[in-house]
Structures are given as C-alpha cells and as structure tokens.
Curated annotation (Swiss-Prot):
Residue ranges occupied by any PUM-HD domain in the UniProt entry: 435-778
Gene3D superfamilies, per the entry: Leucine-rich Repeat Variant
High-level lineage: Eukaryota, Fungi, Dikarya, Ascomycota, Taphrinomycotina
Protein name (record): Pumilio domain-containing protein C4G8.03c
CDD domains tied to this protein: Pumilio
PROSITE patterns membership: PUM (PS50302), PUM_HD (PS50303)
Keyword Repeat in annotation: yes
Length: 780
C-alpha cells in the first residue's frame, strides 16, 4: 500500500506548482475540477483522509452543500488561496474569520447547476451567483446602524435586502460610500442590477468583503451623532449647504445664531430634516424702514439672505480693520448734512464718523462718485460731471487755425514778457534760474498765438553766462544756431567766450557739438586757433567719443591755413598711438591723412615710424599705416617701408601685421618685394603651414621674379615631409599658387617631386585639388 505521507507530499508539491503559475480568473475553476479528480482517484479514497479534512477540502473548493463548514488548518489554508470565493472572504477587516481561517457559518453554496461550470465568454445571471448571505452573518450592532432600504427588487428572495448587489449599487450612486477610506467604487462587489448580466471577468474582478462594507457603513452612520463642532466637513455636502454651514461655524456675528445642523449627504437613505438657518427679520425690517446701520452688524450675508440694495453713507467692505468700528462719510464733521443725518440715525455722530480723507476719496471708498472733475473713466479732466448727458454737451465750432510762434515769443515765455527797450535792464538772475533752465526744452517748444511788439527777439546779452547750458538742450542749441545764422559777426563774438571755455564738454555733447561746429564756421582766425587750443586740452576724450569724433572730423574739413593744420597735428601727435588704436580716434587720423597734403604730414609719418610695431599689430593701427603708404612717396615712403621690412618676419605671422606686409608687396615695387622674400628664405615651408603667413607667401609667389620664384619652389619641394605640405589646410594653397604661375619646367619638377606620394594624397581632401590642378595644367 502506498504511503499516505509520501502521496500527500507529492500531491502538495504538484498543487503548489499549479498555484505559482498565477492562473487567470477562470483557470481557478479548472484547478477545482482537477482537485476533485485527484480526490476521487486517490488509492486511499475517503478512508485516507479524516472526515473533517475531506469535508473541508471538498466543501471549500467546489461544493459547499451544508449550512456550515468545518475549520481549516492554517497549514492547509494556502492550498485554496487560488479560489476566488476564498479570496472574497479574506478581505481586510472581515470580522467573520477566526484565527483558524474558518469560513463563516452563514455562507452557503447554492448553485443552480450541479457543477457550476464557468467558461470564457459565458454570462451568468444574478440568479446563478454562487452564494447569498444570511442575517446571521451580520452582527446585531451592524444591523442597527444600517438604515432600512425602501426601494429594492423584491423579485429575488434574499435574507437582507440592504446587502444585495442592487443595494450596493444604490449606495454608490447616492454617495454614501464616497468617503470610505482607502477604497474605490470599482473595488466593491459587482453592483449590477437584477435585470442586467455580468460577465465572468466582471464578477471575478469586482470582489471585496461584505464585512468591510458593513464596518465602513457603520462608521459613516456614527458621524450623525457627533457634535457640530467635532464633525469634519464632508465633500458630499452641496455647495450652498457647505457655504451656509461654514458661515455659521466661522462667523462670530450675532446675526448667525448657532443651529444644530445634522449631517447632510446626497443619499436618500438619510433624512435631511435639519433646522434651517433663519435670519432675524426684525433687523432687516428696521434696516429697510429706517435705513439704520447697527455698528456691530457687518453686511456679511449669504447670497440668499442678501438685503435689498439701499443707499448707504458708507461701504463696509472698504473699511480698514482698525477703522471698522467707525463709518466713512464724505461730509465734513461740522457740516449741516451730517447733523441732518444724525437726527435720522444716532449712529452718525461726529465721534463715529471719520473726517473726509483725500486719500479715501481718490480711492472711491464712498458710494457716490468722488471724481466729479472727469469726463469719463480715463480721467480726462475737462471740468464736467462724469455722467453728463451727451445731448447737453456744447457743440464746438470750427477749429481756429493755429498761429506760428516766433522765437522771440518762446524766449519771452522763458525769461518773462519784456520789451526790447527795457529787457536788458532786468537782472539776469531774475530771468534765468536753475529750475527754468531744466525746463528750457519744454518752453522752447511752446507755441504763441499773438504777435506784439513785446515778443521780439531780445538781445543776446540776456543769454550770457548760461550759453553752455542752453547749448546742451536740443531746442536751445537750435535756437542759438539760428541766431548765429541771422547775425554771425555780432553773435559769434558774443557766444565765443563761453563756448571756448566749455568746448571740451560741448564737443562730446549730443547737441552741443553742433554749436561748436557752427561757431567754428563763423569764428575769426584768432578764434579758430583759440578753439583748437581748447580742443587740445581734451583731444583724447573728444576723438574717442562718438559725437566728438564726428565734430572733430567736421572741424578738420574746415581748416584752411597751414597754421591751423600745423597746430592740429601738434596737438594730435603726442596722443598718436592712443588715437590710432581707438575705434573712433582712428577716423580722425584717417581724415587728417586724407585731407592734409603729404608734406604737411611728415611729422605724423615720422611719429608712426617710431611706433610701427605697436600700430602694425593693431586692428585700426594697421589700417592707418596702409593709408600712410598710399599717401606718401619718396623718402617718407622709403623710411616707412624700411621699418616694415626690418620687422617683416615678425609682422607676417601676426593677424593684422601680415596685411601690412602684403600691402607693401602689392605696391609692386620690385626692390621692396625682393627684400621681403630674402627675409623669408629658409622659412618658406614653416610660413606656408601657418594661417596668416601663408597668405603673404602666396603674395610673394605672385609678385616675385621668375628666378626668385624658382628658388622658393625648390625650397618648398625640398621639405622632408612633402606629404604634410600637400595635405595641410594652409600649405596646399601655396602649392596650388605655384602650379598657377609655374612654367612647363617647373610643373615637371613638381610632378617628379610628388610622384611617390600621389597614391597617398589622391583620396585626401586637399590632395585631390592639387592633383586635379596638376593634371589639367600638364594636359593643356
């Protein structure tokens, strides 16, 4: 006979493997049938197991035919964990389970068919659900806390209508289960109605515990007995009820008397017969009849209790917290209007009324409009009431043409209206102050309407002492320039002393520089020299400024005598290096080189020769030297070129100096070219590999004589690593330049020298261009 323990261990291992496969919801019934087969085919049959164990196994797995079930040991309980009915009663909080994991005695299995088969895609009616609950499964304490359900389907006989599927659906729809902690509607039992059908997947998916449902319902029902101050706010309250409840709980106003409001939900199972909040009608009647305002009663009414809108001497919502005990009134404390109001309302006494505050009036804190001097809401002041009738507006006639204001009228509006006869007698301090000087721009733009003898242009003596201030104003500068154009000889003499004294400040001013340029045109010879001396005091500041460099170039164009040119060069040369390297100052030097004759520029060129390296390696300085080479000739040019050739090996490797060396080569003066190439011999290949110097080497190849070019080519081809030169991003252009200017013998020499590296460079980026040019030149 087979050992019972061995067979039991084999059977348990086999069943644990089936359980670990995580069967689908429908596969559990297959395992139930399989377990039945094992039980029937066992060699021990029913004699191998104890009656209690066999009854527990068979009744718990597939056929619970009796009204009660025997306890199941904890060691055997894991065997049935795949059963959906068992998982149904393992929910959290199920009080019906004991520590021995026994089923509740009220669970009965009542299948409509013998084996209750469930196959995929098959629907089962609610009448075929595998179990019902009897009243014994519900404790008496739970039953007492569950209200009676009135509407349910009586066609199906159940022990307790409330716990039927339809009742669960009703509870969910009514909102009674909305506040159940850690649960969702889709986690409850299926809540289909009796007439609907439920698929197998729905039935197996929607499973939970009736006991958990009962506990949560009891907790929810127990909230009805809480005090109003201890009751938590529930989201199921309607908006109007919640707002009303919050107003009553939070407000300390005597208008809101405390009411015992019962818990309100959306469910029809609970009564909503709580006491409605009733307002004190006497307060409202007194308010409407006598227009009285009780001091302690603020108008924080609910929407449905909002009193009728009546005229009020104040707006409570606009009061500050510290002023809430007093009333705002637009009337004065000692006015008759307040006395009349105080007779109707004793609250409106002088001690209870704040005095009229301009700040509050501007904020419109009263009910009546406060800004009575505006036409509309854009605060366009026209002296009319804001709600004036459009029909009563005065019709405007045709607009009168505006008369042009004269300059004299504008000046008189600034200095005061005086006649030309007595204008000079008025002290200047009385005519011009600091505040008026600041507002000069606005006053000069004013337009007059009448012409009179008093509106003539005053004598310029009235402006003396303040010309520099007027020149810095846009309209003042234009006005003074116009005066200069009208009477240049007299007015220039009057303006010059003050302009000369502030010439440095005016030359860099956005508006004053135009006055300096205009005055230099009408100034005499002595005045021009004096102005140049004044400019020399701040030549660097003037030439480095955006406005100063423009005014300085304009003055250079107006220099006519050698004396003026010599004086200007004498002023510029000490600051030559600073001005030549400046973005704005370089334009002043270029203007001098282009405007003055070369013989007058000799001091300037000699100064550049002394600072050649500094200027040649600067972005703006190299441009100045190139302009000098173009303007000079003879000895001056030779001196500059000698200085450049002397340092050409250093300059050719500089980002800006190489342009100066190329400019000397572009002069196409053969002695200069040969001297430069002689400086490069021995470094042709190294210079060809560099970015800046390779451009100068190409320029040497173009301008060199044939004999000199052949010497350069031999040095280039004799480089040990010729492949590096041919494939270099800069040196390959030097080789292409050799091929462009080489004759037949030189091309043959190039082909013979690079033939051994052609297979290596024919597929490179730069080597392909060299071979293509070499092939085209040899074939032609």
């Amino acid at each position: 006979m087979v050992n019972r323990d061995a067979y039991n261990e084999l059977n348990l291992n086999k069943k644990s493997q089936e359980t670990n496969r995580k069967p689908s919801p429908l596969s559990s019934y297959t395992s139930i049938s399989r377990e039945l087969d094992y039980a029937n085919q066992s060699p021990f049959s029913s004699n191998s197991f104890s009656p209690t164990e066999l009854k527990a196994r068979t009744s718990a797995t597939f056929d619970v035919r009796s009204a009660s079930t025997s306890p199941i040991n904890a060691s055997d309980f894991h065997k049935y964990s795949h059963d959906p009915f068992q998982r149904l009663f393992k929910a959290k909080g199920n009080a019906s389970f004991s520590k021995t994991k026994s089923f509740p005695s009220s669970v009965t299995y009542s299948p409509s068919e013998e084996t209750f088969p469930l196959t995929s895609g098959m629907n089962k009616s609610v009448h075929e659900y595998p179990f019902t609950l009897s009243e014994s499964a519900i404790s008496s304490s739970h039953k007492s806390s569950i209200p009676e359900r009135r509407n349910f389907d009586s066609s199906v006989s159940v022990s307790n209508p409330l716990l039927h599927w339809n009742n669960v659906d009703t509870l969910l729809r009514d909102g009674s289960l909305e506040n159940v902690n850690n649960s969702r509607q889709d986690q409850f039992l299926p809540y289909k109605t009796f007439s609907s059908t439920i698929s197998n997947s729905d039935f197996l998916h929607r499973e939970s515990s009736f006991s958990s449902l009962i506990d949560e319902e009891s907790k929810l029902a127990s909230l009805r007995n809480l005090n109003i101050n201890d009751r938590p706010p529930l989201p199921v309250l309607k908006n109007s009820e919640r707002n009303l409840l919050h107003r009553q709980l939070l407000s300390n106003h005597p208008f809101f008397s405390q009411n015992n409001v019962s818990l309100s939900t959306n469910s029809k199972n609970y009564s909503t017969d709580f006491t409605k909040i009733q307002s004190d009608s006497s307060l409202l009647q007194n308010r409407q009849q006598n227009h009285r305002i009780e001091t302690d009663q603020l108008s924080h009414f609910p929407d449905h209790l909002d009193p009728s809108r009546i005229p009020s001497p104040y707006q409570p919502s606009s009061l500050q917290p510290l002023e809430s005990r007093k009333l705002h009134s637009k009337v004065d404390v000692h006015s008759k209007k307040l006395n009349a109001l105080s007779q109707l309302n004793p609250i409106l006494r002088s001690e209870n009324v704040l005095q009229n505050d301009n700040h509050h009036s501007s904020l419109s804190m009263d009910n009546d409009p406060t800004n009575v001097s505006t036409k509309n809401r854009n605060n366009q002041t026209v002296g009319e009431h804001p709600y004036v009738d459009d029909n009563k507006k005065k019709k405007k006639g045709p607009a009168k043409p505006k008369e042009k204001a004269t300059l004299g009228k504008t000046v008189n509006s600034f200095f005061g209206s005086h006649s030309t006869s007595n204008y000079s007698k008025v002290p200047l301090s009385a005519k011009l102050t600091g505040e008026k000087s600041d507002d000069l721009s606005n006053l000069l733009k004013n337009k007059g309407k009448k012409k009179s003898q008093d509106n003539q242009i005053p004598h310029l003596v009235g402006f003396l002492g303040h010309l520099s201030t007027i020149c810095k104003d846009q309209y003042g500068c234009r006005y003074l320039q116009k005066l200069l154009d009208e009477n240049p000889k007299v007015n220039a003499s009057l303006f010059f002393p003050e302009i000369r004294q502030s010439v440095v400040q005016l030359m860099i001013d956005p508006f004053g520089n135009y006055m300096c340029q205009k005055l230099f045109v009408y100034a005499s010879r002595e005045q021009k020299l004096s102005m140049l001396n004044g400019i020399g005091e701040g030549i660097v500041d003037i030439c480095s400024n955006l406005y100063g460099t423009r005014s300085m170039q304009n003055i250079i164009d107006k220099l006519t005598s050698n004396e003026q040119i010599s004086l200007l060069l004498k002023i510029i040369i000490p600051s030559l290096t600073t001005l030549a390297c400046d973005n704005n100052g370089t334009h002043v030097l270029q203007k001098c080189i282009a405007k003055f004759p070369p013989e007058k520029l000799e001091p300037l060129f000699l100064s550049m020769e002394e600072n050649l390296i500094t200027l040649a390696t600067n972005r703006h300085g190299c441009c100045i030297l190139q302009r000098c080479l173009d303007r000079t000739n003879g000895d001056i040019q030779e001196r500059l070129v000698n200085s450049i050739i002397k340092s050409c090996l250093l300059l050719v490797q500089n980002a800006y100096g190489n342009y100066l060396v190329q400019h000397v080569l572009e002069l196409n003066i053969q002695p200069y070219t040969e001297r430069i190439i002689e400086k490069f011999f021995g470094n042709i290949c190294k210079l060809s590999l560099q970015k800046f110097s390779s451009n100068a080497i190409e320029q040497c190849i173009r301008t060199a004589s044939p004999s000199t070019r052949e010497q350069m080519l031999q040095e280039f081809l004799s480089f040990p690593n010729i492949e590096q030169l041919l494939d270099d991003c800069y040196a390959n252009y030097v080789m292409q330049r050799f091929l462009n200017v080489a004759d037949e013998s030189q091309k043959f020499l190039i082909l013979r020298s690079i033939s051994h590296v052609i297979p290596k460079i024919q597929n490179t980026r730069h080597g392909r261009h060299i071979l293509a040019k070499l092939t085209s030149s040899t074939s032609s």
